[in-house]
Each structure stands twice: as structure tokens, then as C-alpha cells.
Swiss-Prot record:
It comes from Mycobacterium tuberculosis (strain ATCC 25618 / H37Rv). The lineage of its organism: Bacteria, Bacillati, Actinomycetota, Actinomycetes, Mycobacteriales. SUPFAM superfamilies: S-adenosyl-L-methionine-dependent methyltransferases (SSF53335). This is Ribosomal RNA small subunit methyltransferase A. The keyword Transferase applies. GO terms for molecular function: 16S rRNA (adenine(1518)-N(6)/adenine(1519)-N(6))-dimethyltransferase activity; RNA binding; rRNA (adenine-N6,N6-)-dimethyltransferase activity. NCBIfam families: ksgA (TIGR00755). Specifically dimethylates two adjacent adenosines (A1518 and A1519) in the loop of a conserved hairpin near the 3'-end of 16S rRNA in the 30S particle. May play a critical role in biogenesis of 30S subunits. Its EC number is 2.1.1.182. The gene is ksgA. It catalyses: adenosine(1518)/adenosine(1519) in 16S rRNA + 4 S-adenosyl-L-methionine = N(6)-dimethyladenosine(1518)/N(6)-dimethyladenosine(1519) in 16S rRNA + 4 S-adenosyl-L-homocysteine + 4 H(+). Belongs to the class I-like SAM-binding methyltransferase superfamily. rRNA adenine N(6)-methyltransferase family. RsmA subfamily. Signal peptide: none annotated. It is found in: Cytoplasm. Disulfide bonds: none annotated.
């Protein structure tokens, strides 16, 4: 289950009236290309913050704060927040909004006007421990992978995305929704669904439901996390899902050099060559690379190559 413990909110949260007033004051019109749909329901932002489990000890990286609904709830939780906003108009107004609704809490907010995909470690004064984000479908996967790679300090990610994207992120091996994002996120941690969000809590109202997804980074990674190893694992994932309906033996022929060598490598990794790539877990891909000479059996984490399966299959809550 998702973490739901929290404290009583004391900061004034934004409602429908405040959201509309702010937009009118700024002469702001939401841009569909940026996925600008803003939450105006206090119970929803409370729920997102509770699902994230953030506390006073956290430095939260909020992606896409918009008009500030979720920002205020995160600050009221006691967290320090760095808000990354791509829209310069919204970024310039956020601190004023927080000051008006929280009095003395604005000192715990830093605003960065930047595309999240261009964000680097040196852009932040301190390493974030958590991410909370409301992401449009077209940037959700690249943004999540970029943040998990760029900021190894992040221990938990809580993201609100379109329901269809949420299903893909947390899908089980072999399911229709299971794909490249499902596997790659599990390289970093356990992935789970945390429920649905109605379109009626947003302005403008989107046409689809949203879903909450939480990613908990492994406390101790069962495999190396350096860029070189990750890229080689991800290469295998991309190969398998480029031809997801093929048998693993046939999908990996070019990578292995021949059909027989492909079968031998799969068997060495305890994978049936007749299995389709869409059924393989992150553990399978890592094991395939290792048993094919892709890395030493002794890893940088001190874990054996035959580490138990902790791929973090999704669970609904």
C-alpha cells in the first residue's frame, strides 16, 4: 500500500476560484502542448502528498508546479521544495502565490525556470530526495528516466500521469501494457499504482482519467548502476521490444551473432529461448547481459549475479 501518513494542512490551498483568478490575473491560457491542466481540488493534492510520503526531512523536486496547488501542499507537509517549471510566466508568479497563501513558508521554495529534460545536478543547490510531479503524457517517460539517472539521491518518485501511461509504467511482464518503460523504471526501483484521479479535479478538464504511480528506488541495487552497465541493459530491452512478438532467440540473433549463439546465451541466463521478449523482467535482462559476458559476476554493489528477483511488480491500492 502507498504511504498515507501525514500532518494536518494549515497553509491555504488553491481551489477552483483561486485557480481561475490567478489565470485571469496573469492573462494566462493553458497550453495543450505543455499538458497544462491544473489541480483545483484540495483533497486531491492532499492525497498526492500523502502517497509520496514526504516529510520535513525531504528536499522535494516538484516538476510542473503550474499555478502552485501541489507546491503549497508540499510546503505545508514541511518539505523544502525546488519547483521546476518550463513556462516562464508561471515560474515568475509561483513565489508570490506561495507567499500570499503561506505567509512565512516561501523561504523553503526555490523556483527554477527550466525544461526538466535539461535539468542537471549543478542546477540545484542541494540533492533532491524525492520527486513529485504532474506530467503530460508526451514527456512522462523520458522525464522520469532522466531524473532517476541524473539524481541518484532521489529515493522516491510520485507522479500523476494519464491513466493509460500509469498502466504502462506499472504493468506486469506479459501483459498488453507491459513495455520498455515498465522494464526500464524497474532497473531503478519498485513501481506501483496508487489509484486513479478524476478529470473533474483539473482545470481545464482533460478528456481522460489520470493515475498515480510511485517508484521506490532500491535501497541497495541488486546490480551495478553505472551508466555503462545501464546502457547495455537498456540496449537489450530495446532490442526485445522492437520485436516483442518474436521469440527471444529470434529477437537477439543480431546481438548474439547467430541463432544458435542467441539460444546459448539465453539458456545460460536460465531463459527459455522460445519466450517472447514481452514476458522478460528486468531481472531476466540483467542476467542475460551478465551471463553473456556483459559484466563481472562480482558487481559494484557486492551482490551476487544470482540475486533474488526484486523487480517490483505493480500492485494496485
Amino acid at each position: 500500500m502507498c504511504c498515507t501518513s501525514g500532518c494536518a494542512l494549515t497553509i491555504r490551498l488553491l481551489g477552483r476560484t483561486e485557480i481561475r483568478r490567478l489565470a485571469k490575473e496573469l492573462d494566462f491560457r493553458p497550453r495543450k502542448s505543455l499538458g497544462q491542466n491544473f489541480v483545483h481540488d484540495a483533497n486531491t493534492v492532499r492525497r498526492v502528498v500523502a502517497a509520496s510520503g514526504v516529510s520535513r526531512s525531504d528536499l522535494v523536486l516538484e516538476v510542473g508546479p503550474g499555478l502552485g496547488s501541489l507546491t503549497l501542499a508540499l510546503l505545508d507537509r514541511g518539505a523544502t521544495v525546488t519547483a521546476v517549471e518550463i513556462d516562464p510566466l508561471l515560474a515568475s508568479r509561483l513565489q508570490q502565490t506561495v507567499a500570499e497563501h503561506s505567509h512565512s513558508e516561501v523561504h523553503r521554495l526555490t523556483v527554477v525556470n527550466r525544461d526538466v529534460l535539461a535539468l542537471r545536478r549543478e542546477d540545484l543547490a542541494a540533492a533532491p530526495t524525492a520527486v513529485v510531479a504532474n506530467l503530460p503524457y508526451n514527456v512522462a517517460v523520458p522525464a522520469l528516466l532522466h531524473l532517476l539517472v541524473e539524481f541518484p539521491s532521489i529515493r522516491v518518485v510520485t507522479v500523476m500521469v494519464q491513466a493509460e501511461v500509469a498502466e504502462r509504467l506499472a504493468a506486469e511482464p506479459g501483459s498488453k501494457e507491459y513495455g520498455v518503460p515498465s522494464v526500464k523504471l524497474r532497473f531503478f526501483g519498485r513501481v506501483r499504482r496508487c489509484g486513479m484521479v478524476s478529470p473533474t479535479v483539473f482545470w481545464p478538464i482533460p478528456r481522460v482519467y489520470s493515475g498515480l504511480v510511485r517508484i521506490d528506488r532500491y535501497e541497495t541495487s541488486p546490480w551495478p548502476t553505472d551508466d555503462a552497465f545501464r546502457r547495455r541493459v537498456f540496449e537489450l530491452v530495446d532490442i526485445a521490444f522492437a520485436q516483442r512478438r518474436k521469440t527471444s532467440r529470434n529477437a537477439f540473433v543480431q546481438w548474439a551473432g547467430s541463432g544458435s549463439e542467441s539460444a546459448n546465451r539465453l539458456l545460460a541466463a536460465s531463459i527459455d529461448p522460445a519466450r517472447r521478449g514481452e514476458t522478460l523482467s528486468i531481472d531476466d535482462f540483467v542476467r542475460l547481459l551478465r551471463r553473456s559476458g556483459g559484466s563481472d559476476e562480482a558487481t559494484s554493489t557486492g551482490r551476487d549475479a544470482r540475486a533474488p528477483d526484486i523487480s517490483g511488480h505493480a500492485s494496485a491500492s
